[in-house]
Structure formats: C-alpha cells, structure tokens
Amino acid sequence: KFKDQFATVETGSKGRLIGCPEAGWNCHDQKRLDIMGIDFEAVELGTEVALLAEAQGSYDRQEPFLMYLWEPHFFFGKNEMVGIGLPPHQACDSFTEANNWQDCGMGSWPASNWAKDYTMNYMNPETMQSPENAEALAFFKKMKFANADQAKMLVRVGDDGLSVEEAVQEWKDSSNDWQAWLP
C-alpha cells in the first residue's frame, strides 16, 4: 500500500526493507516478503553495522525507511522511531530451505513479531529459594526495566562515554521506577 514512499533508486518501483544481515541473523527477509505478497525488496547489507549506518543515514536525511531490530537497542534510544507492527507471532518449523520455504499455511510472516522475550535475571534457584535471600528474590520479581530506558542508557554508554555505573546512577537519579522494586 505504501511501497512508493519507501522505493529507492536501487529498488525501482518496489519499496525497500533494510534487511537483516543474513549470515548472522538467518532471517530470509526476501522470502518472507514474497510469501506475504509484499512488493518490497529486502536490501541486505551484510552486517549489523552496515544496516545501522544505512538506517541512520536515511534517518538523518529524513527519508522514509523500513527495518527491524530487537529491543532494547541503542538505535531506539538515539532516534525517535515509529513501530508499524507485524502479523501475530506463529511458530513455523517448516520455514526452511529444506522444506522449500513453506509458510506453514499461515499466510503470515513466519517468525516475525517474535513472541515477547523477557529479560531474565539469572540466578541459582536453590540459592534464591533459601530464606536468607527472600528480599533479593522479591526484588527480582518486581523488577521491570523498560526497553526505552535501557536504550537511552545504551546511548549514554556507547556514544557519550559514560561507564555502565554512571549511566545507571544517572537513570536512578532521574527515575523513581526502581524504588518500587525494593522489598
């Protein structure tokens, strides 16, 4: 529907998806676009660094672009982005080259809008179940750290040169969210 707004010289009349680095992420963007009948071309640039450079350049020039990344990611802490949403997540074990890229009969974009991935705080279950660690366990159960906050902290560390500790302290000083985590 909006392909003309995302078309470039290299994609002609098709819209452009800045595709994921195929070798590292194994996402098969063009196959997914074709299965869904989306008239876009996946332009795969080889690395995450190249993907981000292309996206940042488009953003800086105020050119429309389409890409996807996980969250939290520093790109979202650095740039104001708009999510477009994807079809509901559905597992699709047959979306493989060996199975000729079948779409499981779903008619949807396999393995997209991935199921929510919750950051887990790794700990020894036996240790955390012991009575002397009850407060620590209560803390981790209450902890909810927004992706947007994490993305901004990633920018402060990666671009602005803060240490992780400094970025955390800055966040703590400007937010009261963490106080609700305390037992």
Specify the residue positions occupied by each region the protein language model found.
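A conserved helix-loop-strand patch within extracytoplasmic ligand-binding domains
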Residues: 1-18
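Hydrophobic, Leu/Ile/Phe/Ala-enriched alpha-helical segments that form helix-helix packing faces
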Residues: 3-6, 32-33, 172
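Surface-exposed patches in mature extracellular/periplasmic domains of secreted proteins
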Residues: 11, 42-45, 67, 152-156, ...
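Flexible, solvent-exposed loop/hinge segments that line or gate ligand/substrate-binding clefts
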Residues: 17-18, 28, 32-37, 41-151
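Glycine-rich anion/phosphate-binding loop at the beta-strand->alpha-helix junction
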Residues: 22
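C-terminal functional modules
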Residues: 127-128, 137-183
